[in-house]
Swiss-Prot record:
Family annotation (PANTHER family): 40S RIBOSOMAL PROTEIN S15A
Family, similarity comment: Belongs to the universal ribosomal protein uS8 family.
Gene Ontology cellular component terms for the protein in this record: ribonucleoprotein complex; ribosome
Domain of life the protein comes from: Bacteria
Keywords: Ribonucleoprotein, Ribosomal protein, RNA-binding, rRNA-binding
One record GO biological process: translation
Official protein name in the record: Small ribosomal subunit protein uS8
MF terms in GO: rRNA binding; structural constituent of ribosome
InterPro entries, alphabetized: Ribosomal_uS8 (IPR000630), Ribosomal_uS8_CS (IPR047863), Ribosomal_uS8_sf (IPR035987)
Subunit relationships: Part of the 30S ribosomal subunit. Contacts proteins S5 and S12.
Amino acid sequence: MSTHDPISDLITRIRNAQMRNKSKVSTPGSRMRANVLEVLKSEGYIRGYASVEHSSGRSELEIELKYFDGEPVIREIERISRPGRRVYASVKNLPRVKNGLGISVLSTPKGIMADHEARDANVGGEVLFTVF
């Protein structure tokens, strides 16, 4: 199935799986989704992910979700920039999520990264979504 917004699809799959206390969830594979998952893994919001190749030639990403005391680690995950309304931020205007307790995930010229990494690299970009 084709999707017009793969990032929103990924976020929705993660949110729905955590509401049902699933340990794993799969999503169609792409390089952008893998880069987003790498940021979530490095920030400690998911346990990990793996690329699974099917005999038909398509790949899927299998995501291991993370829980703490039976509660999902990701409390809120919200899409900011959408295909119909892109949201960009310079390095000076990068949003802080819940006073720095959460992160914003950005697409920058240097790749997909968390907001604090973008501040360190002194780059702005498209604010994809926020996580708390």
